[in-house]
Amino acid sequence: MKKVGTAFLTTLFIFSSFTSAHAEEKKDSKAFIDVSAATLWTAPDSLRPIDVPSATNPVDLWKWTKSMTLDEKLWLTNANKLETQALLGQEVTVVDKKGDWVKVLVHGQPTPRNEEGYPGWMPEKQLTYNQEFADKTNEPFVLVTKPTAILYINPSEKHKSLEVSYNTRLPLLSEDTISYRVLLPNGQKAWLRKNDGTFYRSQNDIPTPAADDLINTGKMFLGLPYIWAGTSGFGFDCSGFTHTIYKSHGITIPRDSGPQSRNGVAVDKEHLQKGDLIFFAHDQGKGSVHHVAMYIGDGNMIHSPRAERSVEIIPLNTPGYIEEYAGARRYLP
């Protein structure tokens, strides 16, 4: 180029016992992501023991990402084991099934690989289908605007349900002075602090961002460790980072760096503006694109670089990057 006592038992019952809610998946059926962020694999049953926390329901993405050594992270990249991530409530189309795994197409992540969505394999238990949620996917929603945020079972915020990612979208049911009441894809309800999200009546209600809006969003994630295929506040890859920044501001761009480099409006290096995406390619910038960053002005860029590092700001002319510069694209109007 993701909790003992009475309160625990209540939480366990409400948020873990979804047998009746899980979709009985059939080919080309629609479903919704039922975990904070589902990690999609290139093939089913590819998990190592260390990957199990990413494949449960609920997931524990912090445990997964923080427990991996560098070599274990590099294995995901070098062996090309992962495809992308999909966030809680995101719609997918199920196109195949092998045992307990399903192949899905993630809506809203454009790719030339499939016009319906980004393909990948995931555990079936991380999907659900609820008609009430399906009926409200085009209604007013709350967009999570913090790197991650906590959903609560009740407005008193005494009992946590789960931690969700930036850019998660959930239908709004009601609100009080400090919280939004939202609908979860399994049909349950939860509360989100208003400080952690923004209400929109529709997708078109999201205002066109200024370049500084995109940059400030990117800066929220400074220091977040890289994760191959990541598109969430639990970790990004390079193109997942730029895709998510733009999408959270109402602009959908391709999921991967190659297609990102072929869309938008081409920009000469001497005319770079804040918010432009800048690309890097093999063979001294003349081969296939392998990396993307966002230009933030004054000769600097912000990016999620690779498994050894975290989201950072560095000069565009940094050795190792400037030699592979392969052009820029503008997606802002």
Curated annotation (Swiss-Prot):
Annotated metabolic or biological route of this protein: Cell wall degradation; peptidoglycan degradation
Residues holding substrate: 83, 118, 237-239, 256-257
Leading EC class: hydrolase
Signal peptide positions (record): 1-23
Documented EC number(s): 3.4.14.13
Keyword Endoplasmic reticulum: no
Residue positions of the active site: 238 (nucleophile), 291 (proton acceptor), 303
Residues annotated as domain NlpC/P60: 208-332
InterPro entries: NLP_P60_dom, Papain-like_cys_pep_sf, Peptidase_C40, SH3_16
Record GO biological process: cell wall macromolecule catabolic process; cell wall organization; proteolysis
Keywords: Cell wall biogenesis/degradation, Hydrolase, Protease, Signal, Thiol protease
Recorded GO MF terms: cysteine-type peptidase activity
Reaction catalysed by this enzyme: The enzyme releases L-Ala-gamma-D-Glu dipeptides from cell wall peptides via cleavage of an L-Ala-gamma-D-Glu-|-L-Lys bond
Pfam families linked to this entry: NLPC_P60, SH3_16, SH3_YKFC_2nd
Protein family: Belongs to the peptidase C40 family.
Subunit structure: Monomer in solution.
Chain's role: Specifically hydrolyzes gamma-D-glutamyl-L-lysine bonds in murein peptides, releasing L-Ala-D-Glu.
Name this protein carries in UniProt: Gamma-D-glutamyl-L-lysine dipeptidyl-peptidase
Organism: Bacillus cereus (strain ATCC 10987 / NRS 248)
Source species taxonomy: Bacteria, Bacillati, Bacillota, Bacilli, Bacillales
Gene: ykfC
